[in-house]
């Protein structure tokens, strides 16, 4: 197993009291995005692998493009952006002056250009996405304009919730929060509440087959007809933290976008979001109970050996082990695969 001692704790999300066995693994909070991973993969990522090593996991061009597009809309619209303060090692809001469209695109294109593809297929996607990122940003801007995202826009706000059924807090970060001063385009049905929260999801074309000229064709990404369960779990947490906010979920591709809210999607109605939040808590309670089985153990390596016997790593999962062969092989050694 790949380990590296951490002498200085620079994670800003570590200020709550945690059980001793959780502290052994530097596990101090739950995150809605972590619920997407099966328990075995989650354990390898967040229990067995230290944060500084986890940051070495391979990414992919899809993720890098998604970050670029999200950053662009923040640069375009946000008046405050939450970032890590290098002095205090804590997340803090920074004032931000919105940028013009072309300036924002140029800035994120420069950031995306620094991404290093991890294999030949990733090179294909990287080169293609350099061309499609601007049009995807334009689609997202249209969606934000329709939603009225322009007043008091805050990006990457830190949301924290302590559920009495859990030992650890749930912590997440919202994409955009904003004041709904001019929302007549959405109709009278949202005369209240005056604040909105927007979760952004991007999808990207994927390479298909090689053409006669040696280049590759790409399959166009499409917006979904319904939101995914994982994304509903995320926005359910945001709704729990911000019950008075009008929640929207937007899917964006290079030539289209689709906005879901409680008026066109039953899953986003308040009572159904409450049900999804309960599903999220169930996942987190299960993981806490699993870890607390070893509350009296003092040997971390022994705990890990016991945990892997209780968890299915699901190495055939379609995305969660896309972390690089070095780390996949390390995990397979743990599970004796």
For every predicted segment, state its role.
Residues 1-19, 146, 186-188, 299, ...:
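Glycine- and charge-rich intrinsically disordered segments
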Residues 1-174, 178-182:
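Metal-dependent nuclease catalytic cores that hydrolyze phosphodiester bonds in DNA/RNA
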Residues 154, 178, 196-200, 246-251:
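A structural signal for short, well-ordered beta-strand segments and their strand-loop junctions
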Residues 160-162, 203-205, 253-257:
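Short, solvent-exposed loop/turn segments at secondary-structure junctions
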Residues 169-171, 190-195, 257-263:
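Short, mixed charged/polar active-site loops
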Residues 227, 241-337:
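Metal-dependent nuclease catalytic regions and adjoining charged, substrate-binding loops involved
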């Amino acid at each position: 197993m790949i380990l590296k001692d951490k002498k200085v704790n620079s994670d800003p999300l570590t200020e709550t009291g945690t059980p001793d066995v959780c502290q052994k693994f530097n596990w101090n909070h739950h995150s809605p995005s972590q619920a997407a991973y099966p328990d075995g993969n989650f354990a390898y990522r967040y229990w067995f692998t230290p944060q500084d090593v986890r940051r070495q996991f391979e990414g992919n061009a899809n993720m890098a493009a998604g970050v670029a597009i999200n950053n662009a809309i923040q640069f375009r619209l946000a008046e405050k952006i939450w970032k890590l303060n290098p002095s205090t090692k804590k997340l803090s809001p920074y004032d931000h002056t919105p940028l013009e469209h072309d300036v924002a695109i140029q800035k994120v294109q420069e950031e995306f250009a620094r991404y290093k593809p991890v294999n030949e297929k990733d090179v294909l996607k990287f080169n293609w996405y350099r061309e499609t990122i601007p049009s995807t940003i334009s689609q997202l801007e249209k969606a934000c304009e329709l939603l009225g995202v322009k007043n008091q826009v805050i990006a990457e706000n830190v949301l924290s919730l302590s559920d009495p059924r859990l030992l650890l807090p749930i912590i997440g970060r919202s994409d955009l929060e904003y004041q709904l001063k001019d929302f007549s385009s959405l109709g009278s049905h949202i005369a209240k509440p005056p604040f909105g929260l927007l979760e952004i999801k991007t999808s990207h074309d994927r390479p298909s087959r090689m053409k006669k000229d040696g280049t590759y064709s790409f399959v166009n990404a499409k917006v979904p007809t319904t939101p995914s369960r994982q994304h509903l779990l995320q926005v359910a947490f945001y709704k729990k933290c911000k019950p008075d906010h009008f929640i929207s979920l937007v899917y964006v591709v290079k030539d289209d976008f689709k906005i879901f809210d409680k008026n066109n999607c039953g899953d986003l109605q308040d009572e159904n979001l409450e049900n999804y939040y309960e599903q999220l808590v169930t996942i987190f309670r299960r993981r806490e109970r699993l870890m607390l089985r070893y509350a009296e153990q003092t040997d971390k390596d022994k705990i890990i050996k016991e945990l892997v016997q209780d968890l299915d790593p699901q190495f055939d999962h379609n995305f969660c082990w896309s972390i690089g062969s070095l780390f996949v092989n390390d995990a397979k050694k743990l599970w004796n695969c």
